[in-house]
UniProtKB/Swiss-Prot annotation:
GO-annotated cellular components: cytoplasm
Protein name: Asparagine--tRNA ligase
Subunit-structure text: Homodimer.
GO molecular-function terms, A-Z: asparagine-tRNA ligase activity; ATP binding; catalytic activity, acting on a protein; nucleic acid binding; transferase activity
Gene: asnS
GO biological process: asparaginyl-tRNA aminoacylation
Subcellular location: Cytoplasm
NCBIfam families associated with the record: asnS (TIGR00457), PRK03932.1 (NF003037)
InterPro entries recorded: Aa-tRNA-synt_II (IPR004364), aa-tRNA-synth_II (IPR006195), aa-tRNA-synth_II/BPL/LPL (IPR045864), Asn-tRNA-ligase (IPR004522), Asp/Asn-tRNA-synth_IIb (IPR002312), NA-bd_OB-fold (IPR012340), NA-bd_OB_tRNA (IPR004365)
Enzyme class, UniProt record, top EC level: ligase
Catalytic activity: tRNA(Asn) + L-asparagine + ATP = L-asparaginyl-tRNA(Asn) + AMP + diphosphate + H(+)
HAMAP family: Asn_tRNA_synth
Species of provenance: Clostridium perfringens (strain SM101 / Type A)
Amino acid sequence: MKDVVLVKSLYRNTSEYSDKKVKISGWIRTLRASNAFGFIEVNDGSFFKNVQVVFDSAKISNYKEISKLPISSSISVIGTLVETPDSKQPFEIQAEEIIVEGMSDSDYPLQKKRHTFEYLRTIAHLRPRSNAFSATFRVRSVAAYAIHKFFQDQGFVYTHTPILTGSDCEGAGEMFRVTTLDMMAPPISEEGGIDFSQDFFGKETNLTVSGQLNAECFALAFRNIYTFGPTFRAENSNTVKHAAEFWMIEPEMAFADLIDDMEVAENMLKYVIKYVMDECPEEIAFFNQFVDKGLLERLNHVVNSEFGKVTYTEAVKLLQESGKEFEYPVEWGIDLQTEHERYLTEQIFKKPVFVTDYPKDIKAFYMRLNEDGKTVAAMDCLVPGIGEIIGGSQREERLDVLKARMAELNLNEEDYWWYLELRKYGETVHSGFGLGFERLIMYITGMANIRDVIPFPRTTGTAEF
């Protein structure tokens, strides 16, 4: 009886353990007891559902102690697994011995009642023990594995790009500065500014906003690569969709144009969603019942739809001709807002859709300029219920065009010398995209706030835990 059985194994292979003695270890979720017998729901973290343990005063020598245990106390239970086909739970464990591993204080905040997500954010160190967050973070784990599996199975090389960087991939300047200088008395340059040449790295350094530029270096050596790591944006955006620290998946593919880029993005999205649905049916059922009642239908729709395609110019025309009054008026040259994206995917196409060929003035410098000189070979993948979930492009491989674009945006070539040099040594057509991992988890779970799909959220004014 030394071997502890995981609760997940009991649920997945119930018949194998039926009428046999098993040992489980976990935490008490609920406990109710009379003078003669009691019931404990135990969760060991391996599975979404709890196990019901029945304990009898005639069999359990420490019955009185067990019957008064507070919620969240940790215990080990030895007993016989008995199938209960006529009950809500498929089986129960009839206890023969219960060992107290660790007591919980009676002021444990997660008692058996409904708690708001706002309250649970204040106890982020404990919220993984709640049903909603147990489900969320298990889905997050499985989705992360599915992403790696999708790319590894197709021969992509997993590449670690730096978190500390001296360049701004997006050219937006919304970056967190990293320094070891004394901010009370920083060294001053001849021009009167801070002298970053005396800093740790000898230059101004920041937390990365994207690994894409570094990833392109590896794509032009390994052909197909992907990154999956943390990124940081110093955007003062206190919204349900923005966080200062989040995770990004960024594949880059050599010898691939925008059409290839969209094909990989569509296949990846479908694969990951289906993988999570197959591996986490209990969690998805929970979200569908308690968080987003249309979730299952929407996920199945995405998995089984052929994604639509429309150019930005066509999309603007469709929106203008729809007769719908938008909060933000639609005109050519604006960046599409969430309301526009959702209308396209929910009302016009009624399925996921790629919007391509955006105006160059609202997109990044590295995107390939189209023949019209006004648009770039960019794509955004829009999905029902959320809008944009993926953004990507064919990269500008022509050195002269790339330099001209950087000059337009007043970007310093010296900061990107190594990126420009890629265009000198065997450049080729190449493409890639970025997927915000938290936004994907929000979509798969139906959770409405990015703060609730990342373990310890970092947002404007918040860096607790």
